[in-house]
């Protein structure tokens, strides 16, 4: 997942809705107020600071707002007849960089700081800056000057990327309603501010949730000793189980006590139920109302206009068609699971209720994997200690993309467990960027897996290039005395996926911050990282990623073959669940009268064939709804069509570690960032229109 901040150039996926900001920036002539904060423009280095106190965050937020507003005001007062490319468009692009970097230092700590007061100050800064962003994005005076420039500028004399910047600026201005009457603009502005606050609060609630359940050892039946030994104990010798991934999924996959799994699933899908349900009940109608004012039928229509899918009709057809194709496979998988459950209930004396419950799904899918393919993830993870996986992952990416990584000693980081690496082009030695690895859970930390773009890789006012900086934030189990952090294979896949986003951030080399890194269409943004997941299903790559944590012995060929063969296990149910989430997202953003919990329950029954647990409200825990994937969750499946096409037609055909294909991928897919349309990049890479054949094959289906 790409987490995108409100800055349009980073587009962190948590804003009130849609990456809607025009992100008007300032003029060359009026840059002086920011010069004192702009030492990073000297050589484009990483100057991000992570030691700001709550007071400093608050003060610097107000300073940034005041200084930025002054420059906007100066730009807005330019005589409209004297607007030029240099004093308007280029000036806007130049100062955009400064604002983004300053903002990062203020709003990113809410996700990673160990200090609760710093997180709170950062969240408030994000809210304050988000309101300001909306104010600036609604500056009609600046919009009129950009429109004037487009009308008078000789577009043939400016670079294609600059022309794209100009055209998108006009387009985004209209999507902000700046062509509408002032009263309507003010109404939209007020609603956007409220939407932004609601989205920030929605995800803050999830991040700060510290719910835990207490179980006896008997209630944790069949869970491995190493997991139980890692748990915090209560005074009465019971065990605390949090709802964070490193606790939740092991329990749901391996605990043989149905009541324990039921309690965990119930708690997990009622996180923040009350407060986030209220937020959704306000947020969804606001989005719909803004879309209507802007001339769109629904919020989904509004956001899809800028994506490769283009319309709700195309998305609905794609999801319904895939659902129908997967229906027989899903039915067969459910039947197999139900038989497993019946047999186990008879053997262990549990009551058999004749159905698959939500808390049964992970458990019996894990059993299916073990029975059909003899893959025991508990044994397998002993070959994936995090240090070995990290070294192998970094080596594979370096070799594939023609890069070199070097760990920075004594790096300035936000937590002592975080590491920083510098990325260089292997052939030229040019520094392309840096990335942070933040791998372990902490209190208050962002609780999923994501890549954060922190500093855009783009041109500075003097023509030099600013290095790109990104952070990979995940939550793998903590190492402990005598035992390193051991990763399940699905965690290795997640690691590879998110690092693919990091490489997109680092390898993109654009002129404008707005197009840097992963600033592509939302239903294209997952393509590069999804494509790279294929490496963790390749035997040669897996050998490079694995070594037994005790004696360094290699993973056996037999175990490798079984793991690779298991790729299609449960693929019907797993894909149908993605369709459920995509359909819920589409429904909530096309019909605001729907109840989120009821809509989720409906699709769980109709499509997945596994009922949602009564009393839960999964959408209230669904961070994507308030994190920038609103109306766009389908993009995960949609983009797999493209990623699988690229992999099978090029990498699989030419060799997955073929450096020529790797450089072709780096140059044609990663390097352009968002300076080209996603479909154009795909056609440049494939030399043809993309098709679904490889995607359907990856799902165990035959292409027509």
UniProtKB/Swiss-Prot annotation:
Tell me the tissue specificity: Predominantly expressed in the liver, kidney and adrenal gland.
Catalytic residues as annotated in Swiss-Prot or TrEMBL = 498
UniProt keyword list: Acetylation, Cytoplasm, Hydrolase, Metal-binding, Metalloprotease, Mitochondrion, Protease, Transit peptide, Zinc
Reactions accelerated catalytically:
Preferential cleavage in neurotensin: 10-Pro-|-Tyr-11
Where along the sequence do coiled-coil regions lie?
Answer: none
* Entries under SUPFAM superfamilies matching the protein: Metalloproteases ('zincins'), catalytic domain
Could you state one GO biological process linked to this protein? peptide metabolic process
Instruction: Explain how, and how many, cofactor molecules are bound.
Output: Binds 1 zinc ion per subunit.
TM region positions: none
Q: Any idea which residues bear N6-acetyllysine here?
A: 664
Read off the Gene3D superfamilies from this record.
Collagenase (Catalytic Domain) (3.40.390.10), Endopeptidase. Chain P, domain 1 (1.20.1050.40), Neurolysin, domain 3 (1.10.1370.10)
Write one Gene Ontology MF term: endopeptidase activity
**One Pfam family from the UniProt entry?**
Peptidase_M3
What is this enzyme's class at the first EC digit?
hydrolase
Residues that hold Zn(2+) according to the record: 497, 501, 504
Q: Which cofactors are reported in the record for this sequence?
A: Zn(2+)
**Task of the protein:** Hydrolyzes oligopeptides such as neurotensin, bradykinin and dynorphin A. Acts as a regulator of cannabinoid signaling pathway by mediating degradation of hemopressin, an antagonist peptide of the cannabinoid receptor CNR1.
In the record, the note on similarity to other proteins reads: Belongs to the peptidase M3 family.
Q: What is this protein called?
A: Neurolysin, mitochondrial
Which gene underlies this protein? Answer: NLN
């Amino acid at each position: 997942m790409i987490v995108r901040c409100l800055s349009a150039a980073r587009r962190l996926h948590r804003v009130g809705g849609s990456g809607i900001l025009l992100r008007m920036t300032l003029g060359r002539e009026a840059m002086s107020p920011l010069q004192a904060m702009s030492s990073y423009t000297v050589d484009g280095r990483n100057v991000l600071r992570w030691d700001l106190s709550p007071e400093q965050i608050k003060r610097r937020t107000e300073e940034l707002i005041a200084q930025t507003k002054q420059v906007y005001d100066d730009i807005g007062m330019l005589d409209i007849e004297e607007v030029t490319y240099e004093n308007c468009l280029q000036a806007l692009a130049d100062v955009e960089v400064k604002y983004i970097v300053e903002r990062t230092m203020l709003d990113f700590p809410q996700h990673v700081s160990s200090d609760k007061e710093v997180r709170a100050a950062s969240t408030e800064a994000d809210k304050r800056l988000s309101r300001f962003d909306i104010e600036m994005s609604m500056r009609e005076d600046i919009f009129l000057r950009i429109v004037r420039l487009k009308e008078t500028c000789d577009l043939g004399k400016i670079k294609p990327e600059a022309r794209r910047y100009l055209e998108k600026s006009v387009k985004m201005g209209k999507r902000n309603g700046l062509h509408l009457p002032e009263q309507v603009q003010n109404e939209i502005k007020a609603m956007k501010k409220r939407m932004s606050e609601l989205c920030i609060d929605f995800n803050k609630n999830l991040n700060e949730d510290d719910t835990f359940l207490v179980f006896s050892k008997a209630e944790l039946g069949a869970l491995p000793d190493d997991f139980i030994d890692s748990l915090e104990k209560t005074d009465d010798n019971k065990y605390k189980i949090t709802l964070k991934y490193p606790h939740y999924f092991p329990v749901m996959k391996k605990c043989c006590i149905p009541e324990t799994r039921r309690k965990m699933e119930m708690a997990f899908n009622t996180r923040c139920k009350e407060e986030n349900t209220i937020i959704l009940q306000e947020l969804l109608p606001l989005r719909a109302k803004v879309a209507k004012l802007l001339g769109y039928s629904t919020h989904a229509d509004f956001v899809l206009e800028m994506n490769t899918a283009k319309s709700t009709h195309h998305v609905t057809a794609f999801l319904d068609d895939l659902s129908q194709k997967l229906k027989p496979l899903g039915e067969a998988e459910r039947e197999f699971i139900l038989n497993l459950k019946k047999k186990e209930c008879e053997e262990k004396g549990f009551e058999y209720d004749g159905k698959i419950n939500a808390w049964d799904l992970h458990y019996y899918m894990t059993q299916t994997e073990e029975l059909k393919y003899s893959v025991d993830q508990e044994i397998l993870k002993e070959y994936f200690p995090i240090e070995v996986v990290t070294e192998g992952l970094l080596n594979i990416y370096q070799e594939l993309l023609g890069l070199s990584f070097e760990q920075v000693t004594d790096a300035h980081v936000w937590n002592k467990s975080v590491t920083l690496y510098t990325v260089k082009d292997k052939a030229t030695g040019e520094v392309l960027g840096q990335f942070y690895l933040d791998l372990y859970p902490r209190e208050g930390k962002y609780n999923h897996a994501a890549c954060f773009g922190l500093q855009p890789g783009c041109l500075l006012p003097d023509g030099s290039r600013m290095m790109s900086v990104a952070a990979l934030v995940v939550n793998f189990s903590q190492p402990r005395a005598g035992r390193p952090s051991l990763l399940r294979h699905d965690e290795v896949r997640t690691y590879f996926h998110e690092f693919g986003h990091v490489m997109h951030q680092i390898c993109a080399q654009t002129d404008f911050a707005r197009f840097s890194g992963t600033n592509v269409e939302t239903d294209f943004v997952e393509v590069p990282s999804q494509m790279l997941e294929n490496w963790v299903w390749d035997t040669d790559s897996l050998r490079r990623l694995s070594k037994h944590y005790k004696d360094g012995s290699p993973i056996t060929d037999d175990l490798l073959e079984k793991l690779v063969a298991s790729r299609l296990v449960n693929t019907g149910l797993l894909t149908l669940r993605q369709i459920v989430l995509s359909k819920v997202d589409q429904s909530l953003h096309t019909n605001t009268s729907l109840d989120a919990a009821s809509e989720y329950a409906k699709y769980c029954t109709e499509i997945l064939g596994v009922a949602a647990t009564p009393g839960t409200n999964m959408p209230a825990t669904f961070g994507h709804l308030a994190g920038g994937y609103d109306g766009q969750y389908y993009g995960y499946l949609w983009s797999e069509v493209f990623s699988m096409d690229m992999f099978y037609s090029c990498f699989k055909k030419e060799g997955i570690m073929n450096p020529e294909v790797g450089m072709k991928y780096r140059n044609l897919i990663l390097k352009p960032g968002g300076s080209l349309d996603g479909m154009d990049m795909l056609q440049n890479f494939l030399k043809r229109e993309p098709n679904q054949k490889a995607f359907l094959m990856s799902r165990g289906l035959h292409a027509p």
